[in-house]
Amino acid sequence: EGDFTPRL
């Protein structure tokens, strides 16, 4: 929550 890191 907070930063959005697009990880599969």
Curated annotation (Swiss-Prot):
Modified residues (Leucine amide): L8
Entry superkingdom: Eukaryota
Biological-process GO terms, alphabetical: neuropeptide signaling pathway
Keyword Secreted tagged: yes
Subcellular location: Secreted
Keywords: Amidation, Neuropeptide, Secreted
Predominant location category: secreted
Gene Ontology CC: one annotated term: extracellular region
Family according to the record: Belongs to the pyrokinin family.
Function: Mediates visceral muscle contractile activity (myotropic activity).
Protein name: Locustamyotropin-2
